[in-house]
């Protein structure tokens, strides 16, 4: 890496913070072989009117590109750039048009990069159309139109939802249909995308306060909340229609119910009560019911064992995820168990990890899988439970009366709990696909040609 990229990386590392007006700038860098670019990815400030709470006021970028030659290398360049930047790139509460233009001109002549100001009051979606239509091609079309709407659906989460429905359909003891499977896949995907788009459209002012969510399209201004709702209505209606006409009315009702449950009930409850986590777990258990109902009646207890697995899995997965970003949830105003009651958060993770054992046993007992499934699923459940127990036990020590009196010991114990939470989260990420894949491998009757004795056992047990 050349000297000048190191200089700008040094500026980024020192955050370029200016205290006047209590405004702080977060800087990110993009380093290329021929061009260096520094961007203000967001502006946060401390508001006295909000009790010192951190607020996020702008996510529109300010770009800096170099106007120097690489031959200009002096020993004092690093200090000169930093001191000049600190003097000229100041943010204050009172900004006038004249002073802003003078500062821009002054910065362009003294700093080794050009400054491109972006009006923070004008979101990208409200800027003149000619500003975005210049040089329009497939690349910009993908970036400006396709990708924002695709991101509204939370693709990775939607894929997981769709796969859970497919796995449940595959485990059904009744015959499968290719057309039915195709309609189930497309309809479930569209319903999940619709629910996620509603969720994003309702929470931009809160999402921009969290690092994990501040790059979402509605927060960036690529899509307005109204556009997000219109998109959600379109794909939601299409998804429910496909499920109704291509599968059956029961699956369509479940799909529509899940859109309402996630997009409205769960999203509304996130800022009111910790019960939102249980509502979110209910959302997770509906897709396996949809997959099962596509081929089999929901009266079969095996369907509820599968749904129970997805319900229970949500807690060790989400509770450990939220533990390590609990302060972000708190600052954004989300009422989560991770910061409201940290010990309960860990205890619930362990409780539902243990619940996986009888649920997997139920799959074999009700003839969905063979009995060999208990061996490998038991090992995977034990792995998840082990880390959930470590996380819970450390939190129990941390929040004991003795530890709470010793800040040094508490902070040290909290660092250990953070590690166990990450371990439990990673175990949960691998746990669910492993459990479902093994269930398909051990589906009842799949290996009867190797173990003919299995075929003679009773096939129905209710």
UniProtKB/Swiss-Prot annotation:
Lipid bilayer topology: Multi-pass membrane protein
EC supergroup of this enzyme: transferase
GO cellular component: mitochondrial membrane; mitochondrion
Keyword field: Heme biosynthesis, Membrane, Mitochondrion, Transferase, Transit peptide, Transmembrane, Transmembrane helix
Pathway: Porphyrin-containing compound metabolism; heme O biosynthesis; heme O from protoheme: step 1/1
Catalytic reaction annotation: heme b + (2E,6E)-farnesyl diphosphate + H2O = Fe(II)-heme o + diphosphate
KW Disulfide bond (keyword) present: no
Domain of life: Eukaryota
GO biological process, one term: heme A biosynthetic process
Spans traversing the lipid bilayer: 158-178, 234-254, 274-294, 298-318, 352-372, 373-393, 425-445
MF terms in GO: protoheme IX farnesyltransferase activity
Activity control, per UniProt: Positively regulated by the hydroxylated intermediate (heme I) formed at the subsequent step, or by HAS/COX15 itself.
Subcellular location: Mitochondrion; Mitochondrion membrane
EC identifiers of the protein: 2.5.1.141
Induction (free text): Not regulated by intracellular heme levels.
Family: Belongs to the UbiA prenyltransferase family.
Record protein name field: Protoheme IX farnesyltransferase, mitochondrial
Organism (species): Saccharomyces cerevisiae (strain ATCC 204508 / S288c) (Baker's yeast)
The organism's taxonomic lineage, starting at the top: Eukaryota, Fungi, Dikarya, Ascomycota, Saccharomycotina
């Amino acid at each position: 890496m050349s000297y000048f990229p190191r200089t700008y990386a040094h500026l980024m590392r020192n955050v370029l913070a200016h205290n006047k007006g209590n405004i702080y700038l977060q800087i990110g860098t993009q380093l290329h072989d021929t061009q260096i670019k520094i961007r203000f990815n967001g502006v946060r400030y401390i508001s006295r009117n909000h009790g010192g709470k951190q607020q996020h006021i702008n996510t529109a970028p300010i770009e800096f590109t170099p106007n120097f030659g690489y031959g200009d290398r002096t020993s004092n360049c690093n200090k000169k750039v930093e001191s000049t930047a600190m003097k000229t790139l100041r943010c204050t509460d009172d900004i006038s048009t004249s002073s802003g233009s003078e500062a821009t001109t002054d910065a362009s002549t003294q700093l080794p990069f050009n400054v491109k100001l972006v009006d923070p009051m004008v979101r990208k979606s409200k800027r003149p159309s000619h500003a975005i239509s210049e040089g329009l091609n497939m690349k910009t079309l993908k970036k400006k139109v396709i990708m924002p709407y695709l991101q509204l659906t939370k693709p990775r989460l939607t894929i997981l939802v769709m796969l859970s429905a497919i796995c449940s359909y595959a485990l059904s003891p009744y015959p499968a249909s290719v057309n039915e499977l195709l309609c189930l896949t497309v309809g479930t995907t569209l319903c999940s995308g619709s629910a996620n788009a509603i969720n994003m459209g309702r929470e931009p002012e809160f999402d921009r306060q969290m690092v994990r969510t501040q790059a979402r399209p509605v927060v960036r201004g690529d899509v307005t909340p109204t556009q997000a709702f219109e998109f959600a209505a379109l794909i939601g209606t299409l998804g429910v229609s496909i499920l109704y006409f291509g599968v059956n009315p029961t699956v369509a009702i479940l799909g529509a119910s899940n859109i309402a449950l996630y997009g409205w009930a769960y999203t509304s409850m996130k800022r009111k009560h910790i019960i939102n986590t249980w509502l979110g777990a209910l959302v997770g258990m509906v897709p396996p019911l949809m997959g099962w109902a596509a081929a089999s009646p929901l009266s079969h207890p095996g369907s509820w064992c599968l749904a129970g697995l997805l319900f229970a899995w949500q807690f060790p997965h989400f509770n450990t995820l939220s533990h390590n970003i609990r302060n972000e949830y708190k600052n954004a105003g989300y009422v989560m168990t991770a910061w409201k009651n940290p010990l309960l958060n860990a205890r619930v993770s362990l409780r539902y990890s243990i619940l996986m054992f009888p649920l997997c046993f139920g799959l074999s007992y009700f003839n969905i899988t063979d009995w060999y499934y208990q061996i490998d699923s038991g090992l995977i459940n034990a792995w998840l439970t082990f880390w959930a127990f470590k996380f819970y036990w450390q939190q129990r020590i941390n929040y004991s009366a003795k530890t709470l009196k010793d800040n040094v010991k508490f902070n040290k114990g909290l660092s250990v709990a953070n590690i166990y939470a990450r371990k439990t989260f990673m175990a949960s990420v691998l746990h669910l696909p492993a459990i479902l894949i093994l269930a398909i491998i051990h589906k009842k009757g799949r290996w009867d040609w190797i173990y003919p004795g299995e075929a003679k056992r009773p096939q129905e047990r209710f």
